[in-house]
Amino acid sequence: MTSAPTLFDVPQPVPPFKTQLLKWIGNKQRFAHEIASYFPDDVGTYFEPFLGSGAVLGTYAPRKGLGSDALKPLSEIWATLSHDAEELKQWYSARRSLVDADFSNKEEVYEKVKASYNNSPNGADLLYISRSCYGGVVRFRQADHFLSTPCGVHKPIPVESFNRRVDIWSERVKGAVFAHLDYRDAMQEARKGDLVYCDPPYTDTQAILYGAQKFVLGDLFAEIERCKSRGVRVALSIDGTKKSGLKEIIHAAPEGLFETEVMVNCGRSMLRRFQMGGATLESEVVADRLLLTY
């Protein structure tokens, strides 16, 4: 495996796009353009099977793409953005408009929306929760998938600001379609000349948060190997050096599966900050690895 310079040391053909639609754990919006700079120039269809906040897809703005996620309400948000952006605006407006001008009932509104979601999981409630919860950490209990994240300390963005973001994003993702799929089913659709970008839920601490879905890294490596055998290029973002207390997590990829490795400096760990109750994290620095099969 060859080691490339850090993403910050190379020219960036993909311009930055810093406008977030969703607040979501693991969001790579700040440096998504640097990740996309390592994508091939001749991509057929772009696949992103762990869509999350859609930061990389939105930044890359593929001519043709499939964005998918195992969390159905999240997939509903993206599908609605694609086929009816005005409805997405209405989802947010209907909930945000319940908040008083002085924000005195902000937490009450949030808890009401959260209760509605837990009673019947849906994209409309999840959209507001993602913009309003603490740190963008949409946390689920593994036992019953109950969404348990508390209300954030920040003020949810105004309806007008959110609507502008929807307009910007709907234009950037117009080449993509969105679906509720297991990552394996999505990756099996990729063909020679296509590109799959994977940003799976982090193991260790984050695995218990993201949609409460079970995830085995070895299974993903096996699917990547099958993609590579068909001529599909795969780019994988994964923990390179993540400090959780005194523990340092380093994953070793199967020999020969990846041909290029890039270290990405992601700054402070948002997840760890949430767990430490807002404490500053001078030693909690995350360095992702970007692994490429090409």
Residue ranges of predicted features:
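Class I S-adenosyl-L-methionine-dependent methyltransferase module
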Residues: 63-174
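Short loop/turn segments at strand-loop or loop-helix junctions that form parts
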Residues: 131-132, 199-202
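Class I S-adenosyl-L-methionine
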Residues: 1-66, 70, 181-195, 203-294
